Amino acid sequence: DERLGLALHPFDLATNKVLAMAGRLEVRDWVDLLQTDASLQTLGLLVWAACGKDPGYNPTSLFAAIRRHHYSQEEVNMLDFEVDPPCAAELGVRWHDALQEAAAFFSLLPAERAGTCVLTESGALFNGSAQELATELEQNRIVFHKGHIRGAWPQIR
């Protein structure tokens, strides 16, 4: 597309960040994942889907690889923010909350669907709690979308 060029869907970017965080120690990956956990889809479901991009991981092993990271205020300050850098201690609290919530998702989801994107029946990214996911699964209102290597052109709506 001449106006937009090639673009990844935000979900693809987020799952790529999960995989990046498993393999390197970059504070920007941590900050980005905290933001996507809050704005796109919960960390547990991003981990669930991301393991489908790398057959060397399952949700539990990928989760273990990312949960070990922690960062200092000095490292956060080195990033370029439009405003003052966030407080690393507050980010750490958010990270531990996201990790605790993420772990609850893995026991609910069917193992044979690991590596898929968890969607609502209308095709939107599921964004509820683990308890809400349990209810949606019981009522067969969850769709598992297996990604593919191909991509899609961006659309302006």
Describe the role of every protein-language-model region.
Residues 1-157:
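Compositionally biased terminal segments of proteins
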